[in-house]
Amino acid sequence: MYKTTRLQSVLIQYKWPLFLCLFIPCVYGADDNESWTSVSFEKKLPYSLKLEFEQELRLADQVSTFKQTFSELSLSYKVFDGLSLQIPYRYSTYKDKVKQRLSIGGSYKYSFKPLSLKYRARIQRTFEKNETPEDLIRNKCTIEYKLNKSIKPYVSGELSHSYNEDPVQLDEYRISFGLKVDIMENSSIKIFYIFKKEDLPKSDPDEIGVFGLAYSLKM
């Protein structure tokens, strides 16, 4: 029993540094590195509704220049424990353009402590002046491990593709890992890294690494 407990302790202590080593080739192999920092607020409403607001800043060109900032407002409805529906609206400002995005989606989370699995599906349409609206379907799977009461490491994968093309072609994929830390009863921070490959139909898709920090407050 003691040996088993000790082995688990060693695995917990070293598995994430080892996991980080697996992602080092992704960091150095990326065409560009970006940073994403965000602040979000969450408020529960009557009738199983929830309102969320997020403000994010993104830097590109090896984290040296402004890429975009966006404000996102999302309304979600809890169908039952684990299942919810969401309608997010995003207003994004770039150097030379503005984009608006409307989405509808749902997510389901299943927990079997200390692990939890979450699947999210979303249909989104992006609007830009003088451009044809862009439609995408996004599918994301996340595995989260509850290390203790306040620390939850996770890994996730996401695929995006157009739903009005035949045959269907993947547009982008993302692989990420991170750490969510509850710093107070109603607030948390998330530190993460994302490796994403964009414009997959191109002969030479863009490979981008993202270092991120997010702060969340439940009101």
Go through the PLM ranges and name each one.
Residues V155, D166-M219:
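Predominantly the C-terminal beta-signal and adjacent terminal strand-loop region
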Residues G29-Q86:
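Start-of-domain marker
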Residues Q55-D61, Y89-K95, Y110-F112, I123-F127, ...:
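Transmembrane beta-strands of outer-membrane beta-barrel pores
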Residues N33-S35, K67-S71, V98-L102, P133-I137, ...:
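Residues that define the transmembrane beta-barrel architecture of outer-membrane proteins
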Residues V39-K43, L73-Y77, I104-Y108, N139-Y145, ...:
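Residues on the lipid-exposed face of transmembrane beta-strands in outer-membrane beta-barrel proteins
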Residues K44, S107-Y110, P114-H161:
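Detector for outer-membrane/organellar transmembrane beta-barrel domains
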Residues C21-Y28:
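Hydrophobic h-region of N-terminal signal peptides that target proteins for export
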Residues Y47-F53, D81-I87, K113-L117, K149-P153, ...:
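Repeated loop/turn-to-beta-strand initiation elements of outer-membrane beta-barrel proteins
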